[in-house]
Structure formats: structure tokens, C-alpha cells
């Protein structure tokens, strides 16, 4: 399954990428900002997205809205669960809390995406 990673912290994005690859997913890109995410979603048309709930202090609800409109599955990977869940679009998705384990994220990706 083709998966896009939306994450503003490089090391976390790389960890997510490793877990997705171990789950059998194909990573089609990594976006670190809202505009970059929206462009990559349109260009790559991933089957699924891991979505950080908060990019550089901004909730990613607009990206979740775009994903819903395109019927693209997503799960939220965030360290700010309570803040993230205040956005109804983000609250409807599966949530993986940071810090996460490699095994936990691999299992979640396999269950929800691959």
C-alpha cells in the first residue's frame, strides 16, 4: 500500500518510515508542512497517510479534511492527543500516541493500512 508520511520532525519521520516498510507498505513521500502535505496528497494520491496532529504548532485538520474528501485512509501520530482530539476530523481517525514503539506502529500500520 502506498503511504504518505506527514511529520515535521525528521527523526520521527524516519522512524515512521522504517515501521511502515516493515509492515509491507511503500512510502511515497514525507511532508513536513501543511502546504507540502496537500501538494503531495494531490500529486501522489497515496492509499493512506500517517498524519502528525500538530505541524509546527498548527493542527492538521485541513489535511484531514482533504483526505476525507478524497476517501484516503489516515491515522494520526501525535504527542498532543488531547489537543489533537479537539479537532473533529482528527478525532475520527485511529490515534497513535508519541512516543510509540517500532512494534506498536508497525502493528497499527499493518492493521489499518497494509
Q: What are these language model-derived features?
A:
Residues 10, 32-36, 103:
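Acidic phosphotransfer microenvironment of two-component signaling modules
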Residues 84, 100-113:
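C-terminal output helix
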Residues 7:
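Conserved acidic carboxylate
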Residues 30-48:
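Acidic, metal-coordinating helix/loop segments flanking the phosphotransfer/catalytic sites
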Residues 10-29:
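Two-component/phosphorelay signaling modules centered on CheY-like receiver
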Residues 51-68:
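Conserved phosphotransfer microenvironments
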Residues 75-78:
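Hydrophobic/aromatic residues positioned on beta-strands within the core alpha/beta folds
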Amino acid at each position: 500500500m502506498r503511504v504518505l508520511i506527514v511529520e515535521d520532525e525528521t527523526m520521527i519521520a524516519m522512524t515512521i518510515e522504517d515501521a511502515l516498510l516493515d509492515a509491507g507498505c511503500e512510502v511515497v513521500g514525507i511532508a513536513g508542512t501543511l502546504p507540502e502535505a496537500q501538494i503531495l496528497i494531490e500529486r501522489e494520491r497515496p492509499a493512506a497517510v500517517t498524519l502528525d496532529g500538530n505541524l509546527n504548532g498548527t493542527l492538521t485538520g485541513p489535511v484531514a479534511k482533504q483526505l476525507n474528501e478524497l476517501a484516503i485512509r489516515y491515522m494520526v501520530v501525535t504527542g498532543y492527543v488531547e489537543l489533537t482530539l479537539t479537532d473533529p476530523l482528527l478525532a475520527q481517525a485511529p490515534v497513535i500516541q508519541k512516543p510509540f514503539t517500532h512494534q506498536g506502529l508497525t502493528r497499527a500500520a499493518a492493521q489499518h493500512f497494509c
